[in-house]
């Protein structure tokens, strides 16, 4: 509980610091003062959520490191966005990327694109928000006897307040905080699970490299979902569609000082995400090793492995807190 409260307090401190020089004119662009490296870090955490924290390690037992093929496609997709879409948006000095649709195709297309974005973000955010609220209910509100509906309303109010306070500038800095927390969490989880397996750094690397689950590339069967070209090409087009044409994510890059800074932030973010996802996959492998050593059973087709290990009685309580 103290961890959760402390995190929200830290969010509000970051929000207050970010919003000190904000006004109505800079709410959507952040005054175009965001440093490229802050945008890069923020872009790492923006598409990653608690669902990623559970599902990516969870898929390793069934699909090995095949997800990395798609992530490599993500990195290529970020280059396409940086060199094709970003110059287009900056050249027209757009606040909303859907403003280009109005210039090119007219008002109806603009409104249609904006509404599709709005509806898709509501649905996606609803799923992520539900996962967060379920976790908060189990860890914090349920022990206090507080109903789930109160949990939902309080969480919505907190998110609304820290976002409203500074606009996109606050969003960028809080996403940066989230990115750092996520990366630290996965690194610490790897450390503590590795410690439970009596691995030093060399032993950990050796165990992961020799594991059957650490295979990355799959070229042998084109009909399989793990086939390289399916994953790689899907990754490229997914990032172009879900990041390059997404106002929520591109608004962060449009807050950069200029097109050069925006490109730099996107490219660094795309490359860094390869390493971050690699950490999640490594965590997945050592979780399967821990399950095997402790004789714990789980369904390989589900994402339950991290939760089982995190709350195992023999595991460090820190892993449960980080989870």
Where are these regions (language model features)?
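Extracellular loop-to-transmembrane helix junctions
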Residues: 1-18, 30, 34, 38, ...
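Membrane-embedded alpha-helical core segments of multi-pass
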Residues: 10, 52, 77-84, 93-94, ...
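Residue-level recognition of pore/gate-forming positions within transmembrane alpha-helices
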Residues: 8-11, 46-47, 74-78, 118-121, ...
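Juxtamembrane interface elements at the cytosolic ends of transmembrane helices
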Residues: 10-24, 84-98, 158-161, 165-167, ...
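Membrane-interface "cap" regions at the ends of multi-pass membrane proteins
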Residues: 1-53, 163-166, 179, 185-188
């Amino acid at each position: 509980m103290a961890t959760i409260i402390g995190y929200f307090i830290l969010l509000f401190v970051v929000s207050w610091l970010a919003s000190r020089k904000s006004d109505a004119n800079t709410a959507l662009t952040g005054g175009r003062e965001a440093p490229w490296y802050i945008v890069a870090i923020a872009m790492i955490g923006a598409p990653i959520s608690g669902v990623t924290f559970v599902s990516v390690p969870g898929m390793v037992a069934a699909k090995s490191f095949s997800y990395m093929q798609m992530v490599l496609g993500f990195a290529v997709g970020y280059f396409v966005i940086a060199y094709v879409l970003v110059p287009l948006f900056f050249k027209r000095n757009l606040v909303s990327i859907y403003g280009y649709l109005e210039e090119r195709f007219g008002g109806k297309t603009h409104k249609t694109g904006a509404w599709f974005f709005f509806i898709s973000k509501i649905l996606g955010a609803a799923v992520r928000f539900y996962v967060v609220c379920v976790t908060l209910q189990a860890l914090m509100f349920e022990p206090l006897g507080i109903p789930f509906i109160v949990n939902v309303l309080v969480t919505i109010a907190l998110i609304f307040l820290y976002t409203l306070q500074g606009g996109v500038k606050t969003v960028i800095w809080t996403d940066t905080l989230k990115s750092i927390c996520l990366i630290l969490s996965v690194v610490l989880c790897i450390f503590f699970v590795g410690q439970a397996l009596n691995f030093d750094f060399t032993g950990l690397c050796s165990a992961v490299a020799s594991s059957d689950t650490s295979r990355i590339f799959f070229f042998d069967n084109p009909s399989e979902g793990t086939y390289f070209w399916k994953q790689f090409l899907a990754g490229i087009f997914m990032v172009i569609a879900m990041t390059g044409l997404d106002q929520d994510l591109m608004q962060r890059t449009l807050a950069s000082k200029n097109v050069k800074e925006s490109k730099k932030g996107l490219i660094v973010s795309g490359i860094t995400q390869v390493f971050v996802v690699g950490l999640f996959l490594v965590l997945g492998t050592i979780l399967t090793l821990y399950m095997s050593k402790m004789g714990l059973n789980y369904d390989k087709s589900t994402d339950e492995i991290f939760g089982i290990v995190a709350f195992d009685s023999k595991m460090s309580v820190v892993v449960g807190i980080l989870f």
